[in-house]
Amino acid sequence: MADLANEEKPAIAPPVFVFQKDKGQKRSAGSSSPEGGEDSDREDGNYRPPVKRERTSSLTQFPPSQSEERSSGFRLKPPTLIRGQAPSAGLPSQKPKEQQRSVLRPAVLQAPQPKALSQTVPSSGTNGVSLPADCTGAVPAASPDTAARRSPAEAADEEKEPQKNESSNASGEEACEKKDPATQQAFVFGQNLRDRVKLINESMDEADMENAGHPSADTPTATNYFLQYISSSLENSTNSADASSNKFVFGQNMSERVLSPPKLNEVSSDANRENAAAESGSESSSQEATPEKESLAESAAAYTKATARKCLLEKVEVITGEEAESNVLQMQCKLFVFDKTSQSWVERGRGLLRLNDMASTDDGTLQSRLVMRTQGSLRLILNTKLWAQMQIDKASEKSIRITAMDTEDQVVKVFLISASSKDTGQLYAALHHRILALRSRVEQEQEAKMPAPEPGAAPSNEEDDSDDDDVLAPSGATAAGAGDEGDGQTTGST
């Protein structure tokens, strides 16, 4: 059956027109026999073998051409038939070669050859002496990934190479064993430093000994960089130790550095100390610290005395004009003056208000006055006497409104004293009591004037009238009387 199928089926498929691809490929209902359908398909050029015949002839037929593959795209093939699995029995098969050509493989990556950098660590000897290239290890075998990527032909070639490599490695190992065993020892950084790094004196002695025994040997300082570094560091340390003695230390040798007028005792003591130090030799730093501290304190004291300038002012006797008066009340308050033009209170200042009493020289009557000075500068802002027609009113719990003579304009003005409620109450009570006493005295004097005047008492009455006029002057309307009283107050206050 297989031979008949191969003979009936042509090896090359008939040509297929492009426009005939889209024709209906279904069998007609009338073609019941598979043979009739096969003949009709052959005539049309779209031959499709039946499924049953393809199963029997799938093992022996040639691979279908490109035109047959395109035409049979809609037909379901059995899952066991895979292209290129079973070659035909009659003709030699070319499927493996076609399969190798059609399959895309990744590029074959060869194992990188070992470079000189990878060989430096195992091949390096003591102090960087490298081993010869013949004594290096064999090339490492390829990884399994690279072996899998290579083609079978390359794998077969590589199977022959291990025998050659083994023979070459054996000869290389024998050659390496013949080399000096001292060069085979690997150098590890940080190991055996005691044997390699030595002090200057020891290294120089050993170098002399080696030069005497082996004149061709090099000195260790020429090859070992650690010895060169240690020698330079030790030289620097010795130089720094010598220079440290000359460094500046705070608090030492202040007698030489602080410019102060020297005293005879200090100069002699310093000279004796220097001579004693020169004779006895160098002393310890702890023993030298004690006299230097003393000299530092002495020189500092002398320096401060020389530079300090004391500005002492001469004591001056302070005269306030209140020496003949006795203070009754003093308090901290704020003083305001009423401005008629702006109809507002203007602050005059704050300070200490004092109420003083003084004895009159004429008849022994009591006189009082209010004195206020600003805080700090002690500038006089209020200086007025108390008289009988003086007006006093308590504006609030913390303020008192009074009429007094202004020291600047020599005019009676309205003042406002603002203080605490306690001080305000005490001041108001003291002022009210003294003003009432003055008024009672004026009334008594007026009653004494009422009887008929006597001829011998006329001059005395005129003098009393003049005194009454002076007392009532602040409340009068004439400006001349106010000016006279102001002059009298200023002279009395000063």
UniProtKB/Swiss-Prot annotation:
Regions of compositional bias (Low complexity) in chain numbering: 274-289, 476-494
Name of the protein described by the UniProt record: Ran-binding protein 3
Gene Ontology BP term (one): protein export from nucleus
Chain segments carrying region Disordered: 1-192, 259-300, 442-494
Xref: InterPro entries: PH-like_dom_sf, Ran_bind_dom, RanBP1-like
Compositional bias per record (Basic and acidic residues), positions renumbered to this chain: 1-10, 43-56
Alphabetized SMART domains for the sequence: RanBD
Post-translational modification summary for this protein: Phosphorylation at Ser-58 promotes its import into the nucleus.
Keyword Phosphoprotein found: yes
Subunit text: Interacts with CHC1 in a Ran-stimulated manner. Interacts with XPO1. Interacts (via its C-terminal R domain) with SMAD2 (dephosphorylated form via its MH1 and MH2 domains); the interaction results in the nuclear export of SMAD2 and termination of the TGF-beta signaling. Interacts (via its C-terminal R domain) with SMAD3 (dephosphorylated form via its MH1 domain); the interaction results in the nuclear export of SMAD3 and termination of the TGF-beta signaling.
Motif (Nuclear localization signal): 49-57
Cellular compartments per GO CC: cytoplasm; nucleus
The encoding gene: RANBP3
Organism of derivation: Pongo abelii
Phosphothreonine PTM positions: 56
Subcellular location: Cytoplasm; Nucleus
Pfam families membership: Ran_BP1 (PF00638)
PANTHER family to which the protein is assigned, alphabetical: RAN BINDING PROTEIN, RAN-BINDING PROTEIN 3
RanBD1 domain boundaries: 305-445
Post-translational modification N-acetylalanine, affected residues: 2
Modified residues (Phosphoserine): 32-33, 40, 58, 151, 260, 280, 282, 299, 466
Modified residues (N6-acetyllysine): 9, 21
